[in-house]
Amino acid sequence: MECDLSIDVPSLTSADRPPTICIVNADSGRLAGRVALVTGASRGIGLAVARRLVAEGARVGLTARHPEALAEAVAALGGPAHAVAVAGRADDAGHRRAAVDAVTEAFGPVDVLVNNVGINPAYGPLVELDLAAARKILDVNLVGTLGWVQQVAAGMDERGGCVVNVSSIAGRTPSPGIAFYGVSKAAVDHLTACLAVELAPKVRVNAVAPAVVKTRFAAALHEGREEEVTRAYPLGRLGLPRDVAGAVAFLASDDAAWITGQTLVLDGGVSLAGRPAG
């Protein structure tokens, strides 16, 4: 069985489309004056992260595959004074260069990179996994993550900056059906630690590892099973994109100035219950 679980989808539905954000901290928020770049930001976790960073005072560049969805996201974030978007594929080095150049031209050098984009185009046992799909997963989730860091690292090393990678609890707990996705995210956790050592002291690098968050990415895995899956969570609910966004904003801010190389698990307590997250 094969399914496309890419974070990015062609467009926002009316139910998913957020209201235009109320920017209350543009001059005094924790990220006032900073420039952020968020990948996979047309919807779901990526859009929630972008929305939170703008609310904290940052100006934000968005990347994803679909121009129409990105245009809607920019409008929801308050328009071009607060956000710009560049459409393209995360595994395309040319797109990564173009996105960083566009954000730099619009707002200035990137201070905060959020590597959110991730895919899982195949579902099923590892022994049946198509190796072309495995390579694609690694190209986007791992190699692409490193590629984005390479695009901004030199500038950050001069000025300071931070990177937040969006990993997954699947990288810590074997998850049947999406095991290779989990392998890619375990590698992202280790990449995070390695980059933190190499890029210190000017650049902090951390990750967040959510369990099941209510997005289309997760819905494709748990269709018809949400109530069953939710029962495993001591906090009594699945995660929401804003839960991840709050953690990312914290790690991107000076409140986390002495934190680097860490992966912050966001799982509603499910790992304490000793059961699979999904």
Regions found by a protein language model. Name each.
Residues 124-126, 133-138, 218, 229:
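Substrate-binding pocket helix/loop in short-chain dehydrogenase/reductase
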Residues 149, 184, 192:
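Active-site helix of classical SDR
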Residues 154, 196-201, 257:
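Alpha-helical segment proximal to the catalytic Tyr-Lys
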Residues 96, 146, 237-266, 271:
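C-terminal substrate-recognition "lid" of short-chain dehydrogenase/reductases
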Residues 42-43:
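Conserved glycine-rich cofactor-binding loop
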Residues 168:
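Residue(s) in the substrate-gating loop at a strand-loop-helix junction
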Residues 22-27, 120-123, 173, 249, ...:
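Short C-terminal tail/terminal secondary-structure segment
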